From Swiss-Prot:
Residues joined by cross-link Glycyl lysine isopeptide (Lys-Gly) (interchain with G-Cter in SUMO2): 119, 126, 132
Gene field: C1D
Protein name, entry field: Nuclear nucleic acid-binding protein C1D
Organismal lineage: Eukaryota, Metazoa, Chordata, Craniata, Vertebrata
Main location: nucleus
Subcellular location: Nucleus; Cytoplasm; Nucleus, Nucleolus
Amino acid sequence: MAGEEINEDYPVEIHEYLSAFENSIGAVDEMLKTMMSVSRNELLQKLDPLEQAKVDLVSAYTLNSMFWVYLATQGVNPKEHPVKQELERIRVYMNRVKEITDKKKAGKLDRGAASRFVKNALWEPKPKNASKVANKGKSKS
């Protein structure tokens, strides 16, 4: 469509949207080709279990989203189709993985360092005798 003459089969107002849609489909196609060029087993061997779960969830979400778009292009309301429940289920698992990731990133308490920090931060008054002894030593020199 890009660079072609405007087709009279559809309203001129949507030409820009159709061009953007075509470009998006081309980008998705390129990403899928890149992703499919590496075998799944080869990819997963390089990742830790949490990263593997993320890859699986993103793949499942992408496929279901593409099916959602397909249903919409066929005139089927995807909101009334079981694909909606599947997308919601995947979203729940994505949130669980995000919670696990956030827990791993959360700071951990180093009790020794915390007690040293608190101990050094507290003010301790000097004994009265210590200051007098220090002053006497200075005056004799």
